[in-house]
């Protein structure tokens, strides 16, 4: 058969893909058991999409465009995307919600982990460790037992110039280069 016979349209007007999709070959036999959720593209035009977080109460999906310095929001009710839901976003990366429904974001620009309060104000949860600034807070999660916020701080982001502000953080840098 010619390659055109297998061509699929994954563009904005494409129909949702349903599982099991015969064109997707899973290496792990458990993959088909993931369910029959359709794959849909809701937005085009993000420079670097990161940190998707679902808000079950508000019924919306939030994500970050790091170099675009914005957060976007897709709402289930109307299916629309709000550009610049939060702008500027501090070059936010990872996002999550705490058990009170407040948004937690890891910011590359100011190198902070923050929480957006109900009234729109911002609370800084962490911005340094042992007197040294962070590298680039990346992803966060809320611990299921005690509600504490756990986050990663890899040795990139603020140390690179991609986001326009190369920094000397003073934070510990990774020394192991090979996979462990």
Tell what function each PLM region has.
Residues 2-180:
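Sequence-structural signature of mature extracellular/luminal beta-sheet repeat domains
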